[in-house]
Curated annotation (Swiss-Prot):
Protein's name according to its UniProt entry: Scytalidopepsin B
Subunit composition and interactions: Monomer.
Active site: 190
One Pfam assignment: Peptidase_A4
Naturally occurring in which organism (per UniProt): Scytalidium lignicola
InterPro entries tied to this protein: ConA-like_dom_sf (IPR013320), Peptidase_G1 (IPR000250), Peptidase_G1_sf (IPR038656), Scytalidoglutamic_peptidase (IPR033863)
Domain of life of the source: Eukaryota
Disulfide bonds: 101-181, 195-219, 248-257
Keywords: Aspartyl protease, Disulfide bond, Hydrolase, Protease, Signal, Zymogen
Coiled coil ranges: none
Amino acid sequence: MKFTTAAVLSALVSAEIAFAAPGGNGFARRQARRQARAAGLKASPFRQVNAKEATVESNWGGAILIGSDFDTVSATANVPSASGGSSAAGTAWVGIDGDTCQTAILQTGFDWYGDGTYDAWYEWYPEVSDDFSGITISEGDSIQMSVTATSDTSGSATLENLTTGQKVSKSFSNESSGSLCRTNAEFIIEDFEECNSNGSDCEFVPFASFSPAVEFTDCSVTSDGESVSLDDAQITQVIINNQDVTDCSVSGTTVSCSYV
């Protein structure tokens, strides 16, 4: 499991801002989440702490590669069912940076909520995340996620529902909010945070139990155009109240995370 340094952790704790948690039900709640994101809610970089007072000691579960010049990260993941009530949530995504480098994250993925609703989203952290339009996600769907960094400040995020055939993409160009280091590549299950509009008050959402296990299959990473093996990936778990709530592992080109 990867541990952040004290300096990185200090910077992270002061900047813990994430995309919105659920509000009401159905369309109105999804609209509220979109409005909340527009108000300034963001995804969180990797957080790992040992403080006794911390409720969520690790907010990422999955696989992290540390290297250089990462260009692309892609995988296909199944959409699980979730429980835990309308306020409970979780997310699955692929991305570049956010662990040892936290100046920016290029990422895309999908959220699940305890009432059976789902979102598809993209983000260039520290800018706000946003929902994709033109794509729907349902339990059991197969979602292909990919991000491409063409430079430290430009790239793209693409999401395709292989079950329905819907495909959406977002391009980023000359992003001034933060530059990628391109030193991390990730396949992640996350317990994300809900913050107010200016990011001054953040809380982790209740982490929704999910089943079956989320499997990132056909995981692919390239560095300067060359394929990178997952053999050296570091495994992390979501840890809440000193308990692992995910069981993540890597086998070949598959990253599997189950709820425990």
